[in-house]
Amino acid sequence: MAARLCCQLDSARDVLLLRPFGPQSSGPSFPRPAAGSAASSASSPSPSDESDLPLGRLPACFASASGPCCLVFTCAELRTMDSTVNFVSWHANRQLGMPSKDLWTPYIKDQLLTKWEEGSIDPRLSIFVLGGCRHKCMRLL
């Protein structure tokens, strides 16, 4: 069975919480470095590598130019789990007018998280559940 994650942004601690969604929905949170925070040089990536940072423990297909696995990657608002939507289809509809599908990764990393942090994102994705796939997960930094 595919893993499901509940993703929430805790703006007070500047942490993106990724928790297993199910009977026991408690799990570790994975901190995302703040834009201006200073970290030790041994653990922080160089500025040139910053654009390649994975978003938590998401499947490798999530950052591909073609998007995540179409058949098993879904999202839904936590309160209305009966109305899940395919994340690739949802994103494709939002992407109409964008010149290239190669903008998938920058859109997710920059636009989606920026809107999320500013509180101006579509409420359907402010708290959402992502269905996993069979691809290997990207490693955490």
Swiss-Prot record:
Biased composition (Low complexity): 24-48
UniProt protein name: Protein X
Quaternary structure, from the entry: May form homodimer. May interact with host CEBPA, CFLAR, CREB1, DDB1, E4F1, HBXIP, HSPD1/HSP60, NFKBIA, POLR2E and SMAD4. Interacts with host SMC5-SMC6 complex and induces its degradation. Interacts with host TRPC4AP; leading to prevent ubiquitination of TRPC4AP. Interacts with host PLSCR1; this interaction promotes ubiquitination and degradation of HBx and impairs HBx-mediated cell proliferation.
Region span, Mitochondrial targeting sequence: 68-113
Cellular compartment(s): Host cytoplasm; Host nucleus; Host mitochondrion
Keywords: Activation of host NF-kappa-B by virus, Activator, Apoptosis, Host cytoplasm, Host G2/M cell cycle arrest by virus, Host mitochondrion, Host nucleus, Host-virus interaction, Modulation of host cell cycle by virus, Transcription, Transcription regulation
Annotated stretches, region: Disordered: 24-52
Source organism of this protein record: Woodchuck hepatitis B virus (isolate 7)
Alphabetized Pfam families for the sequence: X
Presence of the UniProt keyword Hydrolase in the record: no
Parts of the chain that traverse the membrane: none
Role, per record: Multifunctional protein that plays a role in silencing host antiviral defenses and promoting viral transcription. Does not seem to be essential for HBV infection. May be directly involved in development of cirrhosis and liver cancer (hepatocellular carcinoma). Most of cytosolic activities involve modulation of cytosolic calcium. The effect on apoptosis is controversial depending on the cell types in which the studies have been conducted. May induce apoptosis by localizing in mitochondria and causing loss of mitochondrial membrane potential.
Leader sequence residues: none
Homology family: Belongs to the orthohepadnavirus protein X family.
GO biological process: DNA-templated transcription; symbiont-mediated activation of host NF-kappaB cascade; symbiont-mediated arrest of host cell cycle during G2/M transition; viral genome replication
CC terms in the record's Gene Ontology section: host cell mitochondrion; host cell nucleus
Entry comment on modification after translation: A fraction may be phosphorylated in insect cells and HepG2 cells, a human hepatoblastoma cell line. Phosphorylated in vitro by host protein kinase C or mitogen-activated protein kinase. N-acetylated in insect cells.
Cystines in this chain: none
